[in-house]
Structure formats: C-alpha cells, structure tokens
Amino acid sequence: MKLKFCGFTSIKDVTAASQLPIDAIGFIHYEKSKRHQTITQIKKLASAVPDHIDKVCVVVNPDLTTIEHVLSNTPINTIQLHGTESIDFIQEIKKKYSSIKITKALAADENIIQNINKYKGFVDLFIIDTPSVSYGGTGQTYDWTILKNIKDIPYLIAGGINTENIQTVNQFKLSHQGFDLASGIEVNGRKDIEKMTAIVNIVKGDRENE
C-alpha cells in the first residue's frame, strides 16, 4: 500500500515525515487553500525531501506558465491536477516534461467511472477525493462503496482518511493502491508525528525505523 502525506507547510514537518516509509509528500500551490505555499516556499520544503520519496505539487486549473515555474524552480517530480484540466493540457505538460508524473484528482460522485475513462491513459495515478467546491482538503469522507466498481486502475483514496476510519476502508476490499492524507495527520492544523506514525503502522506495518 502506498502512502502520500499532503499539505506540508514547514521544514520541521517535512523532515519528520521523511523519516517514515511513505511514498510521496505533497505541497499545495493554490491560493484559496489554507495550506497554500508559494513556489519559493515549495522549493525550500521539497528540497528537504529525500530522493526516494516523490515530491508532489498540487495545483488547481493552472496554466502552463504556472507548471513551468514550478518545475523550473523546484525539485518537484509529480504534478497533481485537482481541477477540471483538459486532456490537451495534460498532453502539453507530458510533451514538454516527459519525465514528470501526472496525478489526477477526481471527485467520488456519480460521474467517477466516466471521468476515470476520460483521463485513463493520460495520467499516471488517480486520487479519488470527497466531492467539494474547494477542491479537496475538507477532512470530509464519502461513501467508499462507490469505489467497488473501480478495478485495474491505479488510485489512492483521499477524503477524510484518518487513524479511526482507515481500517474500515480496508474492509471493503477495494482495488486501491493506497491512501492520500492531509487533515487526518494533523492536530490544530499542523502535521502531527504521532498521527503520521500511526497511519504508517496501520498501512505498512511497524516499519518506521527501517
């Protein structure tokens, strides 16, 4: 199972998370988000992430110039598109930055299968999140049974995942590759090492010291 921890805003938290056996660390470049970081801040934060952990920049309906600024000025190796980006736009990114991974976030609503089929073949990974006008980060969950028909597609489950409900999700025997957490590893809006460690232990076993 893969783990992505997202929404980091401090070097201290990035350093702590990087000691755990997680797969990706995310930074949000979207001014309407409470976890928004400038490109300068993302450069500093992402530089503290070791090479074996993917460095993800989350953007919402960006233009190509924004993508260029992120990729030219930071060590980011994955772009997570969290809006209504077009296939043509994704192909533009891939054409210019062939080594960059593209993740597409989708809302867990009645159109989920249709939207997966739309983007399938153009992105490397899906994030399936709680439907929200604020494009994620709400801490709210959704009916995970909607994911039962999604098979043979690489995706992470996001949306209010925490230490209390993550084992419930696993009882549904879904085909997900892992989880994406932000609010579920926070206390009072700040990343919490105890919660991060607890999630790692649940998902990957007691391996944080390896």
From Swiss-Prot:
It is an enzyme of class 5 (isomerase). InterPro entries: Aldolase_TIM, PRAI_dom, RibuloseP-bd_barrel, TrpF_fam. Its EC number is 5.3.1.24. It catalyses: N-(5-phospho-beta-D-ribosyl)anthranilate = 1-(2-carboxyphenylamino)-1-deoxy-D-ribulose 5-phosphate. One of its GO terms (biological process) is L-tryptophan biosynthetic process. Keywords: Amino-acid biosynthesis, Aromatic amino acid biosynthesis, Isomerase, Tryptophan biosynthesis. One of its GO terms (molecular function) is phosphoribosylanthranilate isomerase activity. The keyword Signal does not apply. The keyword Isomerase applies. Coiled coil: none annotated. Pfam families: PRAI. Pathway: Amino-acid biosynthesis; L-tryptophan biosynthesis; L-tryptophan from chorismate: step 3/5. Signal peptide: none annotated. Belongs to the TrpF family. This is N-(5'-phosphoribosyl)anthranilate isomerase. It comes from Staphylococcus aureus (strain MRSA252). The lineage of its organism: Bacteria, Bacillati, Bacillota, Bacilli, Bacillales.
